Each structure stands twice: as structure tokens, then as C-alpha cells.
Amino acid sequence: MTRMDGALTPGVGFVSIYILGSTTMTDRQIIVPDGMRLLCEHAGYAPAVKVGKTLYCAGQVGRTPELSVIEDPEQQFLAAWENLRLVLGAGGCEFEDVVEMTTYHVDMHRHMPTFRRVKDEVFPRSTCAWTCIGVGELARPGLLLEIKCIAVQR
């Protein structure tokens, strides 16, 4: 709570004003699932940051806990969704809480049928705003997909 003095209100006199609900740096919670500690130490990033009930998830890719890229596209896509599920869960959310999602695809048109099939198996349909972007490359050679999202805990 922040106090602001100095408001002179006609008929009332000098009034102190309190501002409620302001967000401070202490309201931010860094979310790191147990299985991602090595990645966070290696890459120096937070898988998610939670402010209030809103969870901002960094891009998740299909790699093993040992940071190896999974070569098979379908298995890589499944692993990316599983990594996102772990991040959401560590932040108190689930797929149904996602309100916005952006996916980045290398060789998008070649892999889109497989990606959509996997997405439809694991992610609820029509529950969020989704933007799909084709890119030339991602952080590591062999990565085909990165998924980032924003979720609001219900």
C-alpha cells in the first residue's frame, strides 16, 4: 500500500490517499520445476515468472532433462508439450488456464500436420488465442518447435 499526502478536497479538508493493489518486484515469483534446474543453471533463465495469478511461461522445447535435442519430430513435439505442462504445473496452472500461446516452427509446413495431431492429443481445443510463427532456426540445431504461453490461474 502506498500513501500519497497532499490532496485538498473542498468541503472535506486535507485527505490522505492510499493506493491499493500496486505490483512490486516482491510480487514476482520465479518458477523452476525440479527437472529444469540444470537447464536454468546452464542457460540462465527462468522457465516462468508468476505475478499475481498470471503465469508467463518462457518458450519450451522438446529436449531431454539432460538437455539433448530429441530428433524424432513427433517425440520432440510431445516432449515440448510435456515440458510446458511441467512449467504450468509448477506455477499452479494447467493447459486449460492458458489464455495466449505462441508457437515457433522450423520448417513449419513440413511438420505442421504432425504438430497439429500431437497438439490436438494433448492440448484442449479452442481454449486460447494462438499465434503460429515460422522461423529459420531456434536456440539449438535440430530443434523444430518452441512453445511459449501466458496462463491465468483459476
Task: Give a label for each model feature.
Residues 13-82, 86-99, 105-154:
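N-terminal presequence-like segments and the immediate start of the first folded domain
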Residues 5-7, 12-15:
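Acidic, Ala/Val/Gly-enriched low-complexity intrinsically disordered segments
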